[in-house]
Every structure is written in structure tokens, then in C-alpha cells.
Amino acid sequence: EKPLYPLEHQQKIDQIDDWISHKYLPSLFRGAIDGPFDRNFIKTSWRLAALVNAQTPLPFYIRFIWPFGLRRARFINDMSQHIDFSLSIKDMHMQLFMELLEHIGDGPFMGELEKPTMLDFAVFPQLVFGYMFGLEEQLSAAKHPTIKAWLARVSEHLPENPLLASDKMQVNSLKEALSN
């Protein structure tokens, strides 16, 4: 049995889960809230629309206006209540990256736990999605040796495509990125 929420680590897991829910995950939407509305944002938005369309067909006009819709999406704007806008996007990402390193600590898994928990499975997909599905050319999270090693350890407990996106839309292999 592999419990995702072992009760003997309940306090530690709850503390890190609060960080994930109220800081880490909302930060992923920062660029859609107040990032530059430039060619890269539009390209990334259209790729996201294509990924959604592969699972649930969308009319062309919805895919076309996707970049504008992201800026106005209620769930994204609701997330903004948890974001510290006093930091630049770059500084916020650096701060969260350092906090992620602290939460992994000496590992092998988040919270310095011996087995992966819901914490690892909540953060892992966020770090690999962009690379696996063509939103970024390199697995940027794997540039740091601690994160790369953690990603490799977590990936051993997951299928080849651990994400909720169509296999046919996957453009990069996680295994390949982690073996370099």
C-alpha cells in the first residue's frame, strides 16, 4: 500500500499542501493575469487551446480567442487573491523555486519523506507539463540538480505520460530530458 496522505506525517503534509494551494499553484497563472500580452503569450495560449481541443473539441473561434479568454477567466482571476503582486513575476518565480527546494530538502521526496505523497504528485505535473507538451523547449526545472533528481524519483512512480493531456499531443519525452 502506498498512501498519498500518511497520517504519521499529517502536520508536515498539511503545511506544505497549504503552500502548494495558496502560493505555488496560483503563481502558475501570474503570467495570464499581468504578464506581457505578447507573441509568446499568444503562441502559448493557442498551444494550450490545441491541447484542450485534442480531448474536447472546441469551435475555431474559441481556440482563436483563447489568449483573451485566459486573461478574463474567472478561476484564474480568483487565484489572483493568493498572489503577491509586490514582486515582479521573475522575483516571484525565484522565491517559489527556493521555497520548493526547501520543501524537498534532503528528500528523497517533498517534506523529506521516504515515499511520494500527494505533495509530490501535485507539483510534479506543473513542472513537466510545459516541456512534455511543447510549451517550452527545455525542461527548465531540471536545470537545478536537486529538482532534476527529485523529478526522476517521482517519475519512477508514474506512467510515461502522467498528465491529463492526450498522448498524441506529447512532443517531448520526460525520460529523455531527465537522462541528459
Predicted feature locations:
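GST superfamily/GST-like fold recognition
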Residues: 113-132
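A mid-sequence, solvent-exposed acidic-amphipathic segment
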Residues: 68-111
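Acidic, serine/threonine/proline-rich low-complexity intrinsically disordered regions
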Residues: 135-144
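All-alpha amphipathic helical-bundle segments outside canonical DNA-binding/catalytic cores
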Residues: 5, 11, 107-119
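Acyltransferase donor/substrate-recognition loop-hinge adjacent to the catalytic core
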Residues: 47-83
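Charge-dense, extended regions
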Residues: 150-180
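A non-catalytic, amphipathic alpha-helix used as a structural packing/dimerization or gating element
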Residues: 12-15, 19, 88-95, 99, ...
